[in-house]
């Protein structure tokens, strides 16, 4: 893994365009820092056994997440994979509800039943959070088809990891989207690694955005360390999708930790780990804003203190929130209520004899 040049493609340069207002840029920095501190607190809670299951973090991808969500209108829909905490925050969901979901509490964004990988919020049009690699692709494409069928003007954004481009659902979804001119933007979050496998070792075409050519789909690559560049590229992609031209966007980024909290990332060389320390997107963006007079040591400290308070409050809220009632386990599985025929609830031994219906019990008594 010492040959990092084969793992991460050169980050593309951003075309010169008018920059956002100063307060917007500072807002991007704050959003990125909130995601960073939130994910760090989540990692800590996981090691303290306050969070169960799997836990995948957006550490290192803060600029990518912030830029993408800054481009997406409130009316538009978002589908993500299991690395979605930062997207939920940047989409506008309260940090305490996101943290409560990680803790599995009833006050969480998915009522405590979704956990880290399955966050869902109709109000903010976040339609998952999917634990299966590529599971969001067909559903996002179907949502775009529904928009087109109803004559709506919304757009679907579907993010996926670089490890997803080799599965069948990727081809099927892009093919259908291109054939039917669906309003959808597919965003490949290329952090260079599918768990521990490099893109160069898993894809015959390492320039992943070039895969759009197979579907005659417009595509582009953008530097995921710059939230402004990401937003500009995403706006262009969304405008194309809204006019009936699906789009494939590849964002080059890095993850600062392993695939999940429990992954020690030993497949990385010491040189690569050291390089990543100097390519921290928050430090890079903060330095730019400081050089342009938009931030100074006092404002950076103030933002840091504010964000720390938000994250601490979120963790306290999650820890003090109640666990969901067992009876609500099936309440949020479907959009409409369905009969629940299950007779075994969580907490019952798997092989505990179930009570027989009255008729069967009576018949059994006769046979005895």
Where do the language-model regions lie?
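Conserved acidic/glycine
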Residues: 1-64, 71, 256-257, 265-266, ...
């Amino acid at each position: 893994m010492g040959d990092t040049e084969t793992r991460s493609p050169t980050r593309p340069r951003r075309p010169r365009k008018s920059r956002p207002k100063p307060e917007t840029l500072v807002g991007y920095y704050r959003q990125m820092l909130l995601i960073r501190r939130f994910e760090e607190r989540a990692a800590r809670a996981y090691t303290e056994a306050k969070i169960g299951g799997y836990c995948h973090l957006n550490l290192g991808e803060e600029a990518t997440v912030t830029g993408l969500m800054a481009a997406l209108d409130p009316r538009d829909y978002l589908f993500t994979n299991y690395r979605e905490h930062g997207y939920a925050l940047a989409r506008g969901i309260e940090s305490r509800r996101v943290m409560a979901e990680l803790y599995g509490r009833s006050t969480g964004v998915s009522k405590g039943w979704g956990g880290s990988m399955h966050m869902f919020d109709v109000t903010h049009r976040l339609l998952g959070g999917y634990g299966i690699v590529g599971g969001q692709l067909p559903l996002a494409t179907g949502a775009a088809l529904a928009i087109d069928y109803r004559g709506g003007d919304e757009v679907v954004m579907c993010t996926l990891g670089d490890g997803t481009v080799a599965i069948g659902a990727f081809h099927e979804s892009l093919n259908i989207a291109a054939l039917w001119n669906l309003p959808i933007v597919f965003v490949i979050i290329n952090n260079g690694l599918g768990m521990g496998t490099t893109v160069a070792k898993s894809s015959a075409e390492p320039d992943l955005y070039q895969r759009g050519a197979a579907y005659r789909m417009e595509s582009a690559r953008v530097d995921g360390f710059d939230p402004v560049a990401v937003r500009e590229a995403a706006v262009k992609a969304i405008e194309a999708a809204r006019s009936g031209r699906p789009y494939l966007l590849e964002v080059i980024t890095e993850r600062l930790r392993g695939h999940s909290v429990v992954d020690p990332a030993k497949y990385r060389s010491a040189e690569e780990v050291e390089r990543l320390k100097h390519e921290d997107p928050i430090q890079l963006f903060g330095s730019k804003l400081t050089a342009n007079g938009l931030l100074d040591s006092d404002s950076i400290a103030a933002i840091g203190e504010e964000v720390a308070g938000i994250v601490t409050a979120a963790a306290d809220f999650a820890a003090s929130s109640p666990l969901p009632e067992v009876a609500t386990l099936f309440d949020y599985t479907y959009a409409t209520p369905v009969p629940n025929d299950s007779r075994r609830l969580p907490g019952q031994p798997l092989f505990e004899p179930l009570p027989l219906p009255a008729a069967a019990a009576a018949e059994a008594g006769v046979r005895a």
